[in-house]
Amino acid sequence: MSMLCYTLIIAFLIGIWAAPKSEDNVPLGSPATSDLSDTSCAKTHEALKTSRNIDQHYPAPKKAEDQEFGSAANIIVDPKLFQKRRFQSPRVLFSTQPPPLSRDEQSVDNANSLNRNIRAKREDHPVHKRGEYSVCDSVNVWVANKTTATDIRGNLVTVMVDVNINNNVYKQYFFETKCRNPNPVPTGCRGIDARHWNSYCTTTNTFVKALTMEGNQASWRFIRIDSACVCVISRKNENFG
């Protein structure tokens, strides 16, 4: 009888040890996944640093309950989405304020700019040496509140403006490069022989990974943003004979 009782107790303990925990079966992106370990949270905050060097004087991230009811910030994003390096892009950053364009510039702190594109400090195209100029003049800007974009398949998708991570709200910023003027000189691009060539400056695009909305879930997609300013030239028709 004692051997039978011993066997039943062992079987009962094995059953308890093998029973799956309920939190292991929670689908990715659900609110329950916000209860992560301290190690996972630390990795998430590292991924959210602007240029991996956030100014310590930035204000604390806004709480989700401070946002308007029904906003996209109420959709919780799983921090695990930020742990894979292939999803990280130097042109897409998550921060409470627009990052500086370079280490030498100060960040922009303008509370009135939240409802439009946030433009950081701009300056004329630098001249490194006397007599050296750029064919086209470009400007770098941090773009916020981007609500829609074209994905790599040509479809119009919804871009997440605010990201709710562990009940903290971060804004998604895009570093874009645009042409300042399609004709920096009256004849088109600077330095082009206008006697034989037509020229103009135009903005080109690239695709970056960004957080977008798919139903009520957040997902990574390649979207198109402005990335460079180039000169386009074409030969003028010449009459021979």
Curated annotation (Swiss-Prot):
Entry keyword Signal: yes
SMART domains linked to this entry: NGF
Annotated localization: Secreted
Tissue expression profile of the protein: Expressed by the venom gland.
GO CC terms in record: axon; dendrite; extracellular space; synaptic vesicle
Chief place of localization: secreted
Signal peptide per UniProt: 1-18
Family membership noted in the UniProt record: Belongs to the NGF-beta family.
Function: Nerve growth factor is important for the development and maintenance of the sympathetic and sensory nervous systems. It stimulates division and differentiation of sympathetic and embryonic sensory neurons as well as basal forebrain cholinergic neurons in the brain. Its relevance in the snake venom is not clear. However, it has been shown to inhibit metalloproteinase-dependent proteolysis of platelet glycoprotein Ib alpha, suggesting a metalloproteinase inhibition to prevent metalloprotease autodigestion and/or protection against prey proteases.
Protein name (database record): Venom nerve growth factor
Lineage of the species this protein comes from: Eukaryota, Metazoa, Chordata, Craniata, Vertebrata
